[in-house]
Amino acid sequence: MTVDEQVSNYYDMLLKRNAGEPEFHQAVAEVLESLKIVLEKDPHYADYGLIQRLCEPERQLIFRVPWVDDNGQVHVNRGFRVQFNSALGPYKGGLRFHPSVNLGIVKFLGFEQIFKNSLTGLPIGGGKGGSDFDPKGKSELEIMRFCQSFMTELHRHIGEYRDVPAGDIGVGGREIGYLFGHYRRLANQHESGVLTGKGLTWGGSLVRTEATGFGTVYFVQEMIKAEGETLEGKKVIVSGSGNVATYAIQKVQELGAVVVGFSDSSGWVSTPNGVDVAKLREIKEVRRARVSSYADEVEGAEYHTDGSIWDLTADIALPCATQNELDGDNARTLADNGCRFVAEGANMPSTPEAIDVFRERGVLFGPGKAANAGGVATSALEMQQNASRDSWSFEYTDERLHRIMKNIFKSCADTAKEYGHEKNYVVGANIAGFKKVADAMLAQGVI
């Protein structure tokens, strides 16, 4: 049986066993396509059911989360934790609180996390979790009660050497605080390393808040350097206006580029003169208002509800909002308008068709599992500080993050070249991330 037939047969089986999980199917299909190249060259990676084991979570947890609102009404949400692979270290990955969360989305995120964490070079496995709870419109006490109920079940499955969750969409510093506080009460110990994204006074790390956005920019900076260019003077589109987007905007402008647009779920803002990051942070983090407020208050900025942010002309695009936000038509428009570099700050924000268009049109593309690995890398640095009872300076932590992102780019670039797909960073990231995990799995036996 040829490698194509082996992979095709396995993927057909995976579709049947994981029906109704399109995001998970999409993530696996992309990786399997890259792995065909590895299996042709190194067939021993097909031994001992390795591919099947890699695509099957070690453990899937689904649990009810009952909580009481401010009016005394009981609500029941569903909680998830997918502990996907621990060959390299304890499961590591965020918690997402959003109405869209279901098992398929958590599995897709956990599967991507395996390769992302592997690429960091740090000893962490892959996992992901969350709930279909919506924090929007909830009071402080309602969010606290929900977090405490969620942790009442989750606490028995996590630990600094077992599984280390962090934040994600809907789970910020406030939620991490409530989750950690309840874990501490249930466990009767101050186990700092059990969660990352903590407050600075109780075990958190500097740069953690900025890490994903900064890291995405450090990655695209390496992509540009490899072409003999710099960020200076380049025009950049950044979708989103949350944590990742805000700090990507800050860092890319510090390095000399101009951000010409950003967005939220209500619309997008064109900013031909660049973005006032302090004003954006005040609007989104303090007032929690829509991006239309930015256009109302900053001269030269315009708010749009029609068209797409991807209609803007730019050299670089950084999708930092949510999965599948950038489709094939958007990709064609970007390429037509002269965009030459794309790096994903969000998880899987580009559709498979969009990625194909970028490849066909010669647009260099940095996949999320590599480009946005700065967040989990700095989470692992937080774990290191917790383990040594130490606290590092902002400058030192940022320098470590920058070095990790440079190494991730080099690993992707070198691996892509080794397997005959130079500058295809999707292939490079998938294969480089896979080989490290696969070697560990083969060494540890069939478990």
From Swiss-Prot:
Keywords: NADP, Oxidoreductase
Xref: Gene3D superfamilies: Glutamate Dehydrogenase, chain A, domain 3 (1.10.285.10), Leucine Dehydrogenase, chain A, domain 1 (3.40.50.10860), NAD(P)-binding Rossmann-like Domain (3.40.50.720)
Alphabetized SUPFAM superfamilies for the sequence: Aminoacid dehydrogenase-like, N-terminal domain, NAD(P)-binding Rossmann-fold domains
Pfam families given in the database record: ELFV_dehydrog, ELFV_dehydrog_N
Residues at which substrate binds: 92, 113, 116, 167, 379
Active site: 128
Annotated NADP(+) binding sites: 212, 243
Any one GO cellular component localisation term in the record: cytosol
Site (Important for catalysis) location in chain: 168
Single GO BP term: glutamate biosynthetic process
Listed SMART domains: ELFV_dehydrog (SM00839)
GO molecular function: glutamate dehydrogenase (NADP+) activity
Origin: domain of life: Bacteria
Protein role: Catalyzes the reversible oxidative deamination of glutamate to alpha-ketoglutarate and ammonia.
Subunit structure: Homohexamer.
Similarity-based family: Belongs to the Glu/Leu/Phe/Val dehydrogenases family.
Name of the protein in its database record: NADP-specific glutamate dehydrogenase
Native species: Corynebacterium efficiens (strain DSM 44549 / YS-314 / AJ 12310 / JCM 11189 / NBRC 100395)
